[in-house]
């Protein structure tokens, strides 16, 4: 993964990283802030996935109006979640083979990992043992789950280690995403990674989403559904449920994996629910979690991504104290079948970002 122009500069005792987005645009971030925001992203993943876990796929094409029970102690369950352990395997592949390693090395480590996989990831594992490698392992000809949510929920690390470097994100997602996905399934990973990348420097959630949109093809269905959510938010600025109803009426039946049923693990609809949570959540941690979860479908993955965006924007040190404590309490717990804990993942991601 070749980095854009990046340098470390010392200003009056404060070490900063400067990033050249273009010949005429430079971005700067202190190394302390960079690490805090990376930690906020990983923490958001852990908090969000455990917040929504009891509701996952229990609310299909219907809003969740039931009570949601969560405590910071629940964060300990994040070590069992594929939203996190798959991408930590990809970090392990980088550690072992280097940042420029070919995609098949990542696929090999994914295939041989001891944890359970589902959907597009499970097919990518089977494809490896059948001798089908990237990019064909994610092609619909060999993986009918190619539009599923898999890469979208495990591309976070790419955004975390590429602050302000959208082209790096596109290049890396194109390589890794084709292990298990194709088309909108890859665009979801690019879009989410670009949200994180923008969130290092931008607090306006509308602008963060616009940056994400600019990173994927405008004519793609993924871009279309995100634009629809933004339009619905403008039309119903205080009524997310009305926006949800119109969104579901148009896009609720797009998942080939759930054809003929209400089941939907499609990347773009679940991505739209992430955007809905971000827009209507108003940068409030709990409000963002609640709305994203109540949208239903893959309702542990979606709040996990949504709060990770908030975590990067705010930084770990600005998350609610009880959330910080819940993460710190399990900070050294190792995610299953990986070598990484929260603390070591933050450190490694930070080092790769430099």
Question: Residue locations for each model-derived region?
Answer:
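Mature N-terminal segment immediately following signal peptide/propeptide cleavage
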Residues: 29-52
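Catalytic phosphate/nucleotide-handling subdomain of diverse soluble enzymes
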Residues: 51-53, 58, 62-68, 180-184, ...
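Active-site-surrounding "flap" and adjacent substrate/cofactor-binding loops of secreted or lumenal enzymes
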Residues: 53-88, 103-118
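Extracytoplasmic mature domains of secreted/periplasmic and thylakoid-lumen proteins
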Residues: 98-154, 158-163
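Active-site-adjacent bridging/hinge elements
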Residues: 22, 55-70, 122-136, 161-172, ...
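Accessory "access/gating" subregions that flank catalytic or transport cores
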Residues: 29, 138-146, 162-165, 174-178, ...
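Mature, well-folded catalytic/scaffold domains that follow N-terminal targeting or propeptide regions
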Residues: 38-39, 89, 134-138, 144-152, ...
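Bacterial Sec-dependent N-terminal signal peptides
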Residues: 1-24
